[in-house]
Amino acid sequence: MSTSLVSKPSASKAVVVFSGGQDSTTCLIQALTQYDEVHGITFDYGQRHREEIEVAKSLAKRLKITSHKVMDVTLLNELAISALTRDAIPVSHELMENGLPNTFVPGRNILFLTLAGIYAYQLGAEAIITGVCETDFSGYPDCRNDFVKAMESALVQGMDKQLKIITPLMWLNKAQTWALADKYQQLDLVRHHTLTCYNGVIGDGCGDCPACHLRKRGLDDYLQDKTTVMASLDASEPNA
């Protein structure tokens, strides 16, 4: 009888930047089917809709992910003035003089992906997953594919480690994002238990802020023609 040891394949691991909103929750649900270990990281930056932190904690437990870390990055609140970091600044539907919405938080995704990269290095994870999207994005420059690729390159070079930033929603519209949740039989969970609203209202939200408008329009488009939207999602499967 052989006494040689058979090495066990190392577990595949991913870190999901997890806010508790529709997009990141959908990415988390998908990741649970693709990786042995899924670790969520949520950032407390003193955000206007900070109820999302408790939502993220609740969903992490409900979905039974491997671990969930909430990281204090409230320094960002001091540096970045935005409607999402200042309660006194109302969320506007109009763009600012620089062409960006007043909900844009300068440097937010730069900081989040940097810290997620450090955490992935610590865990030995090969992937960071984030729910940013260029197709239906809200005008944020740090949601663009070019930005994500630049961040990935910086992390790989700066830590001398192979690490991928995966963006499952990058080329999906909101209707297709709803379809992706439905594909994993989690449409109701994402619809009723996530928080996307800038005013901190769970589920369907306040119905007035830009995030709620985008979310509702996508849901309506999906529910009106599920078959067509699901087919378009399947056709884009390499990106989903």
From Swiss-Prot:
It catalyses: 7-carboxy-7-deazaguanine + NH4(+) + ATP = 7-cyano-7-deazaguanine + ADP + phosphate + H2O + H(+). Pathway: Purine metabolism; 7-cyano-7-deazaguanine biosynthesis. Zn(2+) binds at residues 197, 206, 209, 212. SUPFAM superfamilies: Adenine nucleotide alpha hydrolases-like. Binds 1 zinc ion per subunit. It holds the Pfam family QueC. It comes from the Bacteria. GO terms for molecular function: ATP binding; ligase activity, forming carbon-nitrogen bonds; zinc ion binding. One of its GO terms (biological process) is queuosine biosynthetic process. The keyword Heme does not apply. ATP binds at residues 18-28. Its cofactor is Zn(2+). Its EC number is 6.3.4.20. Keywords: ATP-binding, Ligase, Metal-binding, Nucleotide-binding, Queuosine biosynthesis, Zinc. Disulfide bonds: none annotated. The keyword ATP-binding applies. Catalyzes the ATP-dependent conversion of 7-carboxy-7-deazaguanine (CDG) to 7-cyano-7-deazaguanine (preQ(0)). Belongs to the QueC family. HAMAP family: QueC. This is 7-cyano-7-deazaguanine synthase. It comes from Shewanella baltica (strain OS185). The gene is queC.
